[in-house]
Amino acid sequence: MILRIRSRDGTDRITVPDPAAATVGDLQRLIAARVTVPVPLQRLSLDPALLLPSSASAALLADPAAPLSSLRLSNGSFVYLSYPPDARSSQPPPPKALSAAGSFGKKMTMDDLIARQIRVTRQEAPLCAAASFDRDSANAFQLHVAESLAFATKRAGFLYGRVDADTKEVFVDFIYEPPQVGTEDVVQLMRDAQEEARVDAIAHGLGMRRVGLVFTQAVGRKTSDTGEYTMSNREVLQATELQAEGGIPEWVTAIVKLEVGDDGSGDVHFEAFQMSEICVKLFKDGVLETEIGDKDDPRLSKMRKEVVAGGKDTMEVDNDFFLVPVKISDHQGPLSTGFPIENRGNPVAMSALKSHLDRAKHLPFVKRISDFHLLLLVAAFLDIKADVPALTACVKNQSVVPEGYQLLIESLAGA
């Protein structure tokens, strides 16, 4: 039986020779040999929460005599491993002696050499305390990918919402899906500057801003010969570039994927991460390679110069090194999500606006238009500096919509 051992440093595969007779203690010894983490320093769990900064709630596999057969593990199951930052016993090789580089060279001290090294280390805690998603927005996004795309191609969207200044929690209240083209391994965003300006104006009027990225992973995505991976090199690059552009320390990246069980049933899972600060710095400094070839290992990100990662000099870094897990939850946001969503193939027709307004005739007008996707359609006919702020202020405060705006929206619906 092959088990996947996921830690903050990546994912390793462990082969258990006799799973029917093996115990937790046997697994720990196999991990010690393969991952080089001594048994006394290992903390094992079947709960991925073990890898979060606050992992107190994760139930540990604490009894070394417990048989693995009692844990309902199967081939390919994940076991989560936590250990202190410096627990791995493998150490970097001793440095070579340094000498003057000819008559023109300056003799380098060990301190000089260390100062010039780029060290890639794990970031233990995210700058975003937690990420909460509006249930309806998250469901509308994953439902489209599941029912219309069958998780065959990638899909992405920008997350908009609020950041709690005190707790550093992010609340995602709507998802904007820009024009895009997706394949199994790449989603290319065909960004429309004018449309994004309207999106940002609507968000600002609602007291919100762009707070992150969400993308799906296709079931047929490229595999790696070197092991499992959470994000591919292309996904790491795209997420890092957008986090660098995002401009807030709490920026979050969410992954939506379909996990197929042994019985063939599929469950949709949301996971949230931040790209580590060192990853963003490597991108900004031009160290992270941005040209990715079709033959490159998707599990590894290439560097343009040597870095020190995992105690050794390397030109490639395991993508999991750059991921900082973020606790995820859900909430009921202030907006509805019943209006057709933009950029999903066919343009949204004005008849959809009429149908939407007619369905909710029993509600106050401001409630009927409290949907981001509806506001985005209407905003194309409004002044972005005067009308959009005025209309979104009504939605934010749930106040009466001025008659002029109501007549305009109703006339658009009747067009």
UniProtKB/Swiss-Prot annotation:
Compartments (UniProt record): Endoplasmic reticulum
Pathway(s) served: Protein degradation; proteasomal ubiquitin-dependent pathway
GO cellular component, one term: endoplasmic reticulum
Gene3D superfamilies on file: Cytidine Deaminase, domain 2 (3.40.140.10), Phosphatidylinositol 3-kinase Catalytic Subunit, Chain A, domain 1 (3.10.20.90)
Domain MPN per the UniProt entry, residue ranges: 130-279
Keywords attached to this entry: Endoplasmic reticulum, Ubl conjugation pathway
Top-level division of the source organism's lineage: Eukaryota
One MF annotation (Gene Ontology) recorded for this entry: ubiquitin protein ligase binding
SUPFAM superfamilies per the UniProt record, alphabetical: Ubiquitin-like
GO-annotated biological processes: proteasome-mediated ubiquitin-dependent protein catabolic process; ubiquitin-dependent protein catabolic process
Main location: endoplasmic reticulum
Family: Belongs to the NPL4 family.
Record function comment: May be part of a complex that binds ubiquitinated proteins and that is necessary for the export of misfolded proteins from the ER to the cytoplasm, where they are degraded by the proteasome.
Protein name, UniProt field: NPL4-like protein
Native source organism of the sequence: Oryza sativa subsp. japonica
